[in-house]
Amino acid sequence: MTKVTREEVEHIANLARLQISPEETEEMANTLESILDFAKQNDSADTEGVEPTYHVLDLQNVLREDKAIKGIPQELALKNAKETEDGQFKVPTIMNEEDL
């Protein structure tokens, strides 16, 4: 059985920005031990002659052909805009000069 210490659980909780009680820490340690023990079952699997795989499915970059298509006219694109300026959408400022 893999032993998970309270310190390890507290460290993981800290990394995850979680606040857990001492009772939860103990419970989490037991849960993590069970998970790690279950995962150790993979160590006993016979993988002799099994080719390593890097993806679950044997697919490679299934992409459509990149074709240029005609877009909509600028006037139609801007038709429902709340505000426009010089043929572009105008949006509220979210950063000031001092933020840069």
Curated annotation (Swiss-Prot):
It catalyses: L-glutamyl-tRNA(Gln) + L-glutamine + ATP + H2O = L-glutaminyl-tRNA(Gln) + L-glutamate + ADP + phosphate + H(+); L-aspartyl-tRNA(Asn) + L-glutamine + ATP + H2O = L-asparaginyl-tRNA(Asn) + L-glutamate + ADP + phosphate + 2 H(+). Its EC number is 6.3.5.-. GO terms for molecular function: asparaginyl-tRNA synthase (glutamine-hydrolyzing) activity; ATP binding; glutaminyl-tRNA synthase (glutamine-hydrolyzing) activity. Belongs to the GatC family. SUPFAM superfamilies: Glu-tRNAGln amidotransferase C subunit. Transmembrane segments: none annotated. It comes from the Bacteria. The keyword Protein biosynthesis applies. This is Aspartyl/glutamyl-tRNA(Asn/Gln) amidotransferase subunit C. One of its GO terms (biological process) is glutaminyl-tRNAGln biosynthesis via transamidation. It is an enzyme of class 6 (ligase). Heterotrimer of A, B and C subunits. It comes from Staphylococcus aureus (strain Newman). Keywords: ATP-binding, Ligase, Nucleotide-binding, Protein biosynthesis. Allows the formation of correctly charged Asn-tRNA(Asn) or Gln-tRNA(Gln) through the transamidation of misacylated Asp-tRNA(Asn) or Glu-tRNA(Gln) in organisms which lack either or both of asparaginyl-tRNA or glutaminyl-tRNA synthetases. The reaction takes place in the presence of glutamine and ATP through an activated phospho-Asp-tRNA(Asn) or phospho-Glu-tRNA(Gln). The lineage of its organism: Bacteria, Bacillati, Bacillota, Bacilli, Bacillales.
